[in-house]
Amino acid sequence: MGRRPARCYRQIKNKPCPKSRYCRGVPDPKIRIYDVGMKRKGVDEFPYCVHLVSWERENVSSEALEAARIVCNKYMTKSAGKDAFHLRVRVHPFHVLRINKMLSCAGADRLQTGMRGAFGKPQGTCARVDIGQVLLSVRCKDNNAAHASEALRRAKFKFPARQKIIESRKWGFTKFSRADYLKYKSEGRIVPDGVNAKLLANHGRLEKRAPGKAFLDAVA
């Protein structure tokens, strides 16, 4: 018996059912890698960011997430270069899908109980996605902005329902806008922290501040 099509599980109808000690025998999700490309590049390397945003409330299978990751990574590697981007999958397939297998042979009514005790057994996993939730994000340099948008446009065909490609106003994957990031950096208040950045606060105990400085150090 083959895999049941994901269109049968597209709508969110029930409560979340994650893998646990009560829900055993769950197959591993197809997607195992969520960060692709130059994920170790600092926050200053890739200022541009674009998102693929879901426009419907639905279930997205782990197979669809893996297919979208592959096609987006392949296009960005071919067009922009393998060292010119960082792709991140922003949703995780924690919800367990179940199937109640039914026999279709002759005399099946003698062998099974139909819809009696029809809870079903785990078949696969999916991600529960809400309206406005980000599915994929790509950060890169400004000269590769068109390539990043095209890569996400191709990844849209791997998902059901509707999605939108939205250019972020933030600096990379951080929570700061471009103007604020450059302002804080010129003031010396930004401390790089991998793909994100920390903002030094201007409050705290006075004895921890260095003479002539208004902001605390990163270790304070």
From Swiss-Prot:
A Gene Ontology biological process term: translation
InterPro entries: Ribosomal_uL16, Ribosomal_uL16_CS_euk_arc, Ribosomal_uL16_dom, Ribosomal_uL16_euk_arch, Ribosomal_uL16_sf
Keyword Ligase: no
Gene Ontology MF terms in the entry: structural constituent of ribosome
Keywords per UniProt: Ribonucleoprotein, Ribosomal protein
An annotated GO cellular component: cytosolic large ribosomal subunit
Matching Pfam families: Ribosomal_L16
Family named by the database record: Belongs to the universal ribosomal protein uL16 family.
Oligomer and partners: Component of the small ribosomal subunit. Mature ribosomes consist of a small (40S) and a large (60S) subunit. The 40S subunit contains about 33 different proteins and 1 molecule of RNA (18S). The 60S subunit contains about 49 different proteins and 3 molecules of RNA (25S, 5.8S and 5S).
Listed name of the protein: Large ribosomal subunit protein uL16
Organism this protein belongs to: Zea mays
